Amino acid sequence: RTYDIGVVTDKSVKVKFNGKAVPNKNFEQYMDIYIGPKTETKRVYEIPHERWEIGACLSPLDEFTQVSYVNGINTCKGGKHIDFVLNQIVKKMIVYIEKKKKVKVKPATIKEQLMLFVNCVIENPSFDSQTKECMNTPQSRWGSKCEVSDKFIDKLAKMGVMESAIASNEIKAAKSAKKTDGRKTRNIRGVPKYMGANWAGGTKSKDCTLILCEGDSAKAGIVSGLSKEDRDKYGVFPLKGKLMNTLDANLNKINNNEEITNIKKILGLITGKTYTKEEALKQLRYGKLLFMTDQDLDGSHIKGLCINMFHSQWHDLVKIPNFLGFMNTPILKATKGKRTKSFYTDSAYKTWKQANNNGKGWKIKYYKGLGTSTAKEFKEYFAEKKVVMFKYNGETSDNAIDRVFNKTRADDRKDWLANYDKDAVLNPDNNKVSFEDFTDREMIHFSKYDCERSIPNLVDGWKTSLRKILYAAFKRNLISEIKVAQLAGYVSEHSGYHHGEASLNGGIVGMAQEFIGSNNINALLPLGQFGTRLKGGKDSASERYIFTKLNAITRAIYPKLDDDVLYYLDDDGLKVEPEYYAPIIPMILVNGGKGIGTGFSYEGLCYNPTQIIDCLKCKLKGKEYSGDIKPY
């Protein structure tokens, strides 16, 4: 208490203990009494206001503790002043950690890392008792305000509070993960839509195979194709869509993912456990895992995300031979009378087509979705069992998977896509494929397509879905107004659009918007409420109530004479939109755009069409443009 008097009284006051002078230290030096010198314990100190001094360090007790004074009174139980400073530190630290580390930390986790020092002067303070251990004066009556600076937070975070909070968060997440762990048992409950194998979880579980399929319709087809004997050995679980990328996700996010939690229960997986081959066969409810997805590019992505989940969370299972694999199903069939030929790649079909009179007399049916197959065809798939198992090749396989899913390796993905070969595909006759072959010959096609549909084409300025809309509008000769919802249906029918019409409606609305900040030249006309700049166009009316048609200027920019010389794409035998249009001015500059693909992203501003045209005229005449082209 003698040292306390020395720090809270005026420096002119001489303080003695048993006749020996006690040095009058300032508040920063006073902190040494509790936590030792700066060389021993790092701390942060600042004076945010002439009436306030604050300091903080890592708590030596692994729980929150504080030392505080109000007008020279030791408030050992804290009070409103401590709560005010602490809440600021905690809130700012949460934002700081999320920005720097992309990790969400709870306030209690930050608080338990801190030891807080506060010395303040409050006007007419009140306390909760006569011992004056806890100050309860409302903040509005303090006569001053303490604002914790960003510099204080930055120093405190780098001092070790951020690392300690993240470590504590991971420990709590690991404990939480244990609650979602699976175990080997004959019956499991609480997993909707899961159809288990009769032998799963029993003495013959090593002979069982779990099939992860894409959607409920795929599950229905697979179940219809299983024989009575197959029901003993095969379990089926439909995925709702694409799994999250678990490589960079924190444990809390993974624990809260219902899909992953269900897979853990079904297989009997334990978080963080390493499995040898013998342990996997003995402790898991299934001895093998197969993926059955649609034979399109998104299906390849789903397979890749599933592989990534096991590679990042249960790496040893990836190494086990014949544990992970997928079942090949035909991408198309050619039928002539009673004869049927199945093809598992487009290249195999094209080769056969060229050698057989261009397929004349054969009926072609595409099977890009598992839901296209009948129960009879699923029985054929399981009779043939064209199963391909993944093969692990050490660091080469690890690097291939990491390159695709590690968010920090965007530059590596750029180099990867720079070597893209559209003819490089997996051999459907192989029963084993390495993980690196899967990424380089199957996943890469999705990544290339992801860039094409997410990033505007440099030539015409359109993403794939918007180009389909423009193609459909030209094909329909859309000079009379039509409801946006009706146009979306027409686009789906005539351009091979395979995704939800909600995004298609949004694309049509976006192409027609003309408020400031949207399009400099809108390809479609907004006949109705298509949104305002107040909400960035998100406040448009329902697609059922608004109309649109081609803007008269659109056909001038994309001349009809060019239509016959464009290279048109093919989708399931249907002629669809061209690879790109050839506008007479660079629309990528006129309307700008943005998008994030695989490895690449783009964000471009809008520019004045008149200036762009003047610049082009100068270029055509061999002159230099003297104007200054600015965003417009």
Q: Language-model features: where?
A:
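Conserved phosphate-chemistry cores used by DNA topoisomerases
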Residues: R1-Y632
